[in-house]
Amino acid sequence: MAAKEVKFGDSARKKMLVGVNVLADAVKATLGPKGRNVVLEKSFGAPTITKDGVSVAKEIELKDRFENMGAQLVKDVASKANDEAGDGTTTATVLAQAIVNEGLKAVAAGMNPMDLKRGIDKATIAIVAELKQLAKPCTDSKAIAQVGTISANSDESIGQIIAEAMERVGKEGVITVEEGSGFENELSVVEGMQFDRGYLSPYFINKPDTMVAELDNPLLLLVDKKISNIRELLPVLEGVAKAGRPLLIVAEDVEGEALATLVVNNMRGIVKVAAVKAPGFGDRRKAMLQDIAILTGGTVISEEVGLSLETATLEHLGNAKRVVLNKENTTIIDGAGAQADIEARVAQIRKQIEDTTSDYDKEKLQERLAKLAGGVAVIKVGAGTEVEMKEKKARVEDALHATRAAVEEGVVPGGGVALVRALQAISELKGDNEDQNVGIALLRRAVEAPLRQIVANAGGEPSVVVDKVKQGSGNYGFNAASDTYGDMIEMGILDPAKVTRSALQAAASIGGLMVTTEAMVAEVVEDKPAPAMPDMGGMGGMGGMM
């Protein structure tokens, strides 16, 4: 095991503070409408230019191991805020830096670190409760566009396209961000339920010009097994032929004789039919088949529930207005399932999302939720160069997270004003002793840091602006983009309450832990001498090269 170096007390805290400040100073340069860019070196290819706080934080590793520990802890603040709300990483970093700097000053002055932390925690709880009181619901498209615009560093086109996407697919719909091929941002929406399985045979195509199979007012047979014997299907096919409606078969697989017979029947026009594999694998396949059944008002034919193909009737089949199949995807439009059943299924999936700890499972469950509840929108980001494309895509993703957070917990006045207004919650707050009161006062100063930094980045005088904002009330604040004062909400400067809340909670959590640090342990880096050149042994046979 490698030897370790241990630092204690002030010498440990000083080293940690250096790391905190290096990382935070790089990140906070990006805050606000007049925030600057940061250029990140890449091991190959062009450097990346970004105004995204978490991207800057992730790149920073310091040579000194003790300083690096401080930097990594602040990086954790940014990641925590990003994981919970998807945005607010720069605000969280600025808050953490302010808490740590103020806190370590108090520790150096002889305050008890544990009581300081208790004071910080008390004040944080009070401010979070006040932020919830200040939050206004965010329901209309205009407010959603404004939140998106602010989060995308004042790019109105991004705010607008996100608001349009949310309007089209609903608040629960899935919105994905992809790299486009043009200069402009584009939005495409898939309505209905789409899953990534295409037709099993090109002979099902009935629209050769677009290479799709389209079924109008079809019945849907959902089967949880492979179908290879046509005899099993005959009772259902006869019933469907009598009803004179097309049929879509969704099964684990349709193969051999069964598939051949379906193709022949389809080509002869006896039964208009198409077959597709069920989406997903294993348990997820069963769950997705059940989703389709609920959406279309059908029943999954499964031996687990005592149903077999031979006994299936038309009552077991689902209904939809239209189904479109291409080579890769199947889209079911306007399923005939009961609204109450769909809502119950949505609530069930939502509960599973809350309970799961795996990010992959969460993503898949959210996709299922969107397919049932709304639809899927794809934002294709357009840009002039590859470097700009990457930077813009990161901003669109940030803005998307921010708008989702705004819909979830409402909006508060932006530009650091909400935190200043929430200070009233701790104006009378008292701790159990004087050291806790210092912790509360410390947070009172720290929550002004985001507003001060926004003003500093815009070239203003932070103290003057903070005083003027404090003299106002309600939504009154400073618009750094136009250097004017006024009602932040009327000026369209909004922050999601969830983003502000999670930024403060993450900063107070890590800040409190750093203030109470007493020792740091790191590996000793030994300078290994460079290996000597091997003896070439005279290199016989090379005498004539002089």
UniProtKB/Swiss-Prot annotation:
It catalyses: ATP + H2O + a folded polypeptide = ADP + phosphate + an unfolded polypeptide. Disulfide bonds: none annotated. One of its GO terms (molecular function) is ATP binding. Keywords: ATP-binding, Chaperone, Cytoplasm, Isomerase, Nucleotide-binding. Pfam families: Cpn60_TCP1. Signal peptide: none annotated. Belongs to the chaperonin (HSP60) family. Together with its co-chaperonin GroES, plays an essential role in assisting protein folding. The GroEL-GroES system forms a nano-cage that allows encapsulation of the non-native substrate proteins and provides a physical environment optimized to promote and accelerate protein folding. This is Chaperonin GroEL.
